[in-house]
Regions:
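Conserved G1/Walker A P-loop phosphate-binding module
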Residues: 1-94
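Canonical P-loop GTPase G-domain recognition
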Residues: 3-16, 164-207
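Hydrophobic aliphatic residues
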Residues: 43-47, 113, 205
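Amphipathic alpha-helical transducer elements in NTP-driven molecular machines
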Residues: 59, 102-106, 110, 134, ...
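Active-site glycine-centered loops adjacent to acidic/histidine catalytic or metal-binding residues
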Residues: 88, 160, 191
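Flexible beta-alpha connector loops of hexameric P-loop NTPases
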Residues: 92-102, 163-166
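Conserved C-terminal guanine-recognition region of P-loop GTPase G domains, centered on the G4
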Residues: 107-185
Length: 207
């Protein structure tokens, strides 16, 4: 599968007409500085799609990008292309922004996943493979486990930045992450920088 023709549509901070669209949504969520923007750019093949910033916590809205998922293995050409929204949620957990702003973004993120307004199909929760799961990651996982079945969406843990770890460290850290999860939640090791693991993540998104 490939993601093609991705382009920015709009940013929202709450209820919006775009949520009434029948297009399914693939959401990307993660702490500030885990490489979320770089990963989305890598998956879409468009390095300038999501603006990366040296200032964590800069994104304060939920950004929608239209895209076409192309299943190159489909025999029926009518089933090859599917229009979706890629949804880039604000990075969370950055300590240097005011507490009030952090809490506002937290509530906006939770609203997106639990309100039932968004037609979410898949959620990619991006973490830093070296840092492992942090407090808000675990809170998000609990939310996704509770509301995913209710609203019909699946989620995966994308353990990013494995290019910064050697093979032994990668194996050790992934095992620790899986132990923390304690159940059958898929974990895909990736590198948004080098593209390693990209195809596995795309395969999961296609299911």
């Amino acid at each position: 599968m490939e993601i093609r023709q991705a382009k920015f549509i709009k940013g929202i901070i709450g209820t919006d007409d775009i949520l009434k669209s029948k297009r399914e949504q693939i959401a990307f969520i993660g702490r500030s500085n885990v490489g979320k923007s770089t990963l989305i750019n890598n998956l879409t093949g468009n390095k300038g799609l999501v603006k990366t910033s040296g200032q964590p916590g800069k994104t304060k809205q939920i950004n929608f990008f239209s895209a076409i998922l192309t299943n190159t293995s489909a025999d029926d050409t009518t089933k090859r292309n599917k229009e979706v929204y890629l949804v880039d949620l604000p990075g969370y957990g950055y300590a240097k922004i005011p507490q009030s702003q952090r809490e506002k973004m937290r509530k906006m993120i939770l609203w997106y996943f639990i309100s039932g307004e968004a037609k979410i199909k898949k959620v990619v929760l991006i973490i830093d493979a070296k840092a492992g799961l942090k407090e808000f990651d675990l809170e998000m996982i609990d939310v996704l486990k509770e509301y995913g079945p209710q609203y019909g969406y699946d989620f995966v843990i994308a353990a990013n930045k494995i290019d910064k770890l050697n093979q032994k460290q990668t194996h050790k850290n992934l095992n620790k992450i899986k132990e923390q999860l304690g159940e059958n939640i898929p974990v895909i090791p990736i590198s948004a920088k080098t593209g390693k693991g990209r195809n596995k993540l795309l395969e999961w998104m296609e299911k």
